[in-house]
Structures are given as C-alpha cells and as structure tokens.
C-alpha cells in the first residue's frame, strides 16, 4: 500500500529535510514516527528537500507499507510520536504510480520578510528581519523578469548538483501586509538555494541599490558571483506542491498561518 502525507514543520532546529548520520533532520523524525505506527521500517520520499532552517506548510511525501491502518493512524497516530515542530496535516492512500517528487508538476514557496527597524519578539525564527525600508512595488516589478523558462545559473548554489540550470517560473508576486513582505514564487522545480538567491537580489532592488533591469542582466551573465548574497533561510516556506487532478490530493490553506490567502 502506498500512502501520501501532507507535512508541515518548523525547520529551525533541524539540519534540513534529508536524513543524515550525525545530526537531526525532519525526514529522520518523520520516518521514526511512521515506523512506530506501522510496526515496520518506513522510508519516505518527499516532493522537495528543504535546507537547514527552512520551513514547510505544504510538503508532500509518500511511503510504501504492508501495514493495514486507518488513515487516521497516519495523521493522529503519527502526530503523537512526532516532536511539536513537525505535524502531519493529511493522509491519503494513493495509487502505486504516485510519486511525491516525480508526479509533481509545480512547487510553490513563500519568503516572509519582517520589514521594520526593530526586531520581532515572536515569529523570529519564521521571518527574516530587514530593518531598512524595502520598496515592494519595485521588487515585484523586477521579479517579473524571472517568469518563464530561463537559465538560472546566477541564482543556483555553487555546489548545486542539478544537471540542468534551466527552470520554468510560472509566477512571482511580491506583496506587503503591514510590516510583512511576502515573495511568493511558483515554478516547475527549483535549483538549490534558487529561491533564497532570487530573494537576495530582489532585496537589493527593494533597497534602491539596483534597478529592475539588473535581473535580466544577471540571468544573461550566468555567473553566481555577480548576483546578491543568499537571503537568510528562516523566512522561507515550502507552501504547496501541484499534482495532476486525478490523484485527488487534499488542498489546504497555503500558510504560513499568519498570512491571509
């Protein structure tokens, strides 16, 4: 039997999604809890691996098991065995041809900026704090240059292992709600650090250090060293994964929960 799960987590205390030998990860905690409920070793596959300190409200995973359980066992039962900063949001038995990564047609991320001169007292691990005023309208205008299929070499990590730097960005929106700025980006897939590198350059534009024409210049240069530094991880959320309709996976509010959809 193959089961898909929707997962949310606060990545602050974890060394990313992927299971590692000597440090704690979201995957390791989830597999431990699932194995306890299934009474057999469980290995999960995710839609996209998140880095150290990055969060998710819409991560999707799947696993195979011989255990026969009610769907509530994979939600309520697993949540009992998970730490408070990881939770299963939904569970669904799926066909054998479903794959959390390879069946996905798009991923969506939101990067949350707290734009105020004084630091936040709450949500400090869930937002990135920038004291100097950012012009979200200029950031949004510049972000439209990313839409479409491009070579994102200037916006990938130097150690990115993806064979191709090409990605198709479906949409990017930069909006403000009071002191919060949200960079909302959807694409077929993302390169390592791609979202945070994009945000880093948009921040330079929001500060007035660069114009919106800088973005197409960076895309053409195909040189990571020419773009801005990588934005901090704590403002980044994986909020949604798109799959073909026939899988009929549950659709919940994207989050983060303090954002209005």
UniProtKB/Swiss-Prot annotation:
SUPFAM superfamilies associated with the record: Pseudouridine synthase
GO molecular function: RNA binding; tRNA pseudouridine(38-40) synthase activity
Active-site residues, Swiss-Prot/TrEMBL: 51
Positions of transmembrane segments: none
Top-rank taxon: Bacteria
Family classification: Belongs to the tRNA pseudouridine synthase TruA family.
Assembly and oligomerization: Homodimer.
Protein name: tRNA pseudouridine synthase A
Organism, scientific name: Shewanella woodyi (strain ATCC 51908 / MS32)
């Amino acid at each position: 039997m193959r089961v898909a799960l929707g997962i949310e987590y606060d990545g602050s205390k974890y060394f990313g999604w992927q299971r590692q030998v000597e440090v704690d990860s979201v995957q390791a905690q989830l597999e431990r809890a699932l194995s306890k409920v299934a009474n057999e070793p469980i290995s999960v596959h995710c839609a996209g691996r998140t880095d150290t300190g990055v969060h998710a409200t819409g991560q999707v995973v799947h696993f195979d098991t011989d255990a026969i359980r009610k769907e509530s066992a994979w939600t309520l039962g697993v949540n009992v065995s998970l730490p408070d900063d990881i939770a299963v949001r939904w569970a669904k038995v799926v066909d054998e041809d479903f794959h959390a990564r390879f069946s996905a047609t798009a991923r969506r991320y939101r990067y949350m900026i707290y734009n105020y001169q004084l630091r936040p007292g709450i949500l400090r691990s869930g937002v990135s704090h920038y004291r100097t005023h950012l012009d979200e309208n200029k950031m949004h205008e510049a972000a439209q240059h990313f839409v479409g299929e491009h070579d994102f070499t200037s916006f990938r990590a130097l150690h990115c292992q993806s064979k191709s730097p090409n990605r198709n960005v479906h949409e990017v929106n930069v909006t403000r709600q009071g002191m919060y700025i949200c960079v909302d980006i959807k694409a077929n897939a993302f390169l390592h650090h791609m979202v945070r590198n994009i945000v880093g350059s948009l921040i330079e534009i929001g500060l007035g250090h660069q114009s919106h024409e800088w973005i197409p210049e960076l895309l053409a240069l195909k040189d990571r060293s020419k773009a801005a530094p990588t934005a901090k991880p704590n403002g980044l959320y994986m909020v949604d994964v798109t799959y073909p309709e026939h899988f009929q996976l549950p659709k919940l509010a994207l989050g983060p929960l303090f954002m209005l959809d």
